[in-house]
A protein has these predicted regions:
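An extracytoplasmic/periplasmic, membrane-proximal ligand-sensing/linker region
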Residues: 32-34, 243, 265-329
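Hinge/capping helix and adjacent helix->loop/strand transition within the periplasmic-binding protein
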Residues: 85-91, 105-192, 241, 254-287
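Sec-dependent signal peptide hydrophobic core
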Residues: 7-15
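Short beta-strand->loop
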Residues: 113-123, 181-185, 203-204, 213-251, ...
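N-terminal secretory signal peptides that target proteins for export/translocation
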Residues: 1-6
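C-terminal segment of classical bacterial N-terminal signal peptides
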Residues: 16-26
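N-terminal (or domain-start) structured segment
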Residues: 27-116, 155-157, 163, 179-208, ...
Length: 329
């Protein structure tokens, strides 16, 4: 009998069992310190406000504080890269919107792979968009807008918040659906664009309801319709663009939560349960509603749902963005 070989095998087996026990113990103990939730945009913006609302409720579920950190730059790719390179221990999480799906096309030299370098946690909330016109812009309804757009084409100016912004994506989809080309006017954000729209220097703006509800309720803009698949409970008289003749038109600002690739399954489950806990929290539901956000149904609050949705969105936007031949790098 080879005693040294037997001892070596026993030690290896003991080490394997020890690693399993250690991993299980880690998952059971998680979290033992604050968890970072990285936001790729400025404090005070819609994604940041949503993240901070979720963080408060997630903290209750996890038993540790979830701290929101803002990491700005390059349309969210700076923050994405930070998370992709972080330790997959569950202490670095990330919330992002449609930009996660457009980055692989807009940036030809991404330092990460959007599909394979992250752990999927959950979809969380959608924010519909609205198509608005200046009070000085002639069309009053969406059918009138469609007719006018096909007559005037590039004489109509359409604002956006820059390449890859959801306002720009909405404008791209709108022009494709209409078969016309508008004159794009880029701004540093939709806030300045709204000021120009209110002043009559702009014709049209597509922006999320978090930004446009005050103007809509104040009747200082013309509302042509909403970009969601169905009418909104808080804007019941606003038709969808689908209803108005733009078949299959839909764009919402969707949000998902991710972690670095390689997170332990048990940790993913704990984080996912914390997200689901938050999405059922009446305070979160109310504050999300105040933003114009719609909590996704439970069936979408899973890692698999987020993974499938991201793939669909990448495939949806890639041909449109490539056809425009505009890149961010």
């Amino acid at each position: 009998m080879n005693v040294s070989k037997t001892i070596r095998s026993a030690l290896l087996a003991a080490g394997f069992v020890s690693s399993l026990v250690s991993g299980a113990a880690h998952a059971q103990a998680y979290p033992t310190k604050p968890v970072s939730l990285i936001v790729p945009f400025a404090a005070g913006g819609p994604t940041d406000v949503l993240a901070r609302t979720l963080a408060v409720s997630m903290s209750k579920s996890l038993g540790q504080t979830v701290v929101v950190e803002n990491r700005l730059g390059a349309g969210g790719t700076v923050a994405s890269n930070v998370v992709a390179k972080a330790a997959p221990d569950g202490y670095t999480l990330f919330i992002h919107h449609n930009g996660m799906a457009t980055a692989p096309t807009l940036y030809r030299k991404l330092p990460f792979n959007a599909l394979t370098d992250f752990t999927y946690i959950s979809l969380v909330a959608d924010v519909p968009m609205t198509l608005l016109g200046s009070k000085k812009f002639p069309p009053n309804t969406m059918p009138e807008f469609i007719k006018y757009a096909k007559q005037q084409g590039d004489k109509i100016n359409l604002a956006n918040a820059g390449l890859g912004a959801v306002s720009q994506l909405c404008g791209t989809l709108l022009q494709q659906a209409l078969g016309v080309g508008f004159t794009a006017i880029p701004f540093s954000g939709t806030g300045p664009a709204m000021v120009a729209l209110l002043g009559g220097q702009l014709d049209v703006l597509c922006d999320q309801t978090t930004q446009t509800l005050p103007q809509i309720k104040g009747n200082t803009v013309k509302l042509y319709g909403v970009t969601s698949a169905e009418r909104l409970s808080y804007l019941p008289d606003a038709p969808t663009l689908r209803e108005s003749g733009l078949k299959d038109f839909e764009i919402v600002v969707w949000h998902g939560i991710y972690g670095p690739k390689g997170m332990a399954p048990d940790v993913v489950t704990k984080v996912n349960k914390a997200v689901q806990y938050a999405l059922k929290d009446p305070d979160v539901i109310q504050k999300a509603g105040d933003l114009g956000a719609v909590i996704v149904p439970v069936t979408k609050q899973t890692p698999a749902a987020l993974q499938a949705w991201l793939k669909l969105e990448i495939d949806k936007w890639a041909p449109l963005l490539k056809a425009a031949n505009q890149y961010a790098d």
